[in-house]
Amino acid sequence: IKDSDEIYLALDPDREGELIAWHLVEICREKKLIDGKKFKRIEFPAVRKEDILSAINNPREINQNLVNAAITRRFLDRFFGYKISPITKRRTIFGSSAGRVQSPALKILCEKEKEIDVFVSKEFWDVNIELTDNRKHKIECTIVSQGQKKFDKFTINNEKKAKALQEAIKKENFSLNSLNKREKKRNPYSPFSNSLLLQDASSKLGFSPKLTNSIAQELKDGVGSLGALITYHRSDSNKMKSSEIEKLRKIINSEFGSSFLPDKPVSYKERSKFVQQGHEAVTPTELERKPSDIKTELNENQYKLYDLIWKRTFASQMSPSVSLETTYYIKSENFLLKASGSIEKFSGFKKVYNYSEKDNEAQTLPELQSN
């Protein structure tokens, strides 16, 4: 620092990064190293050559509002933690601590636990019928009615009734009575913010939040000779730079064809009004770098997370999927059954990002003709 006229402060693009930059200037001031020197704050969401050069060419002053926000946040952490933790440690068996975030979260858990305690359970049974058409396609159905009696969730309220229905249904012959169809478009998901990444990595990969952030940090810092593989992973934004979107659209058109590319770039709203400005979504730093190209240089978990981020990023700018939402009403002499599901007409973004949603995913139905 003594031999430099200009000092670039390239900390993380968030409140904490701004506070660290401010502290560095203050330390230099205390050590009388500030005279005749210019301190310039730069930030870049990813370790990409164009981002770094752009940041150096467009430095700014330290944002005192962000510094104050970080100081306030730290004060609240310490105010709650230092004041309340000694009390909770004395009054609980396991020496629990308290905090600005964990205490409200604990209150929510306690309220939910109270709801569980006062809940009165009520027995009910599901009877799911699996039918097979003449082409060996399987269709899962539920009971709508038996004669004039309509079924609801609690109609079958004991095992005896369930088994009696099972035996009665086995004796019936079923045919398609009617069907309803409507076309449904499903839009792609936005690129990842940190919270969305944690949710998806948990549901689709079985990763804990701690593991996801740890692996994402490795991908951001760079693996071996690959350099940084993803952008800043603690971002609360789900937006991409326009230049990256244009690059992404060109790759999609080349790799998948024009039918998978919308006429205009897909735009997304921020999920919160408190999103820090300047952040980018969590995306690959080099969009051309396919997961398969670098699989041998990553460990298993690194590959899985990079693959998830890459697919989500590409899917975000692809065409909607199109399906026919279909309901079949299947009848016998005594029963009316219903089968709901979808018939895919165009995969769209699902060609890349087609993870099963399990309970939320409708069954894929075969085409059936009446009777």
Predicted features and spans:
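Toprim catalytic domain recognition across nucleic-acid enzymes
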Residues: 1-371
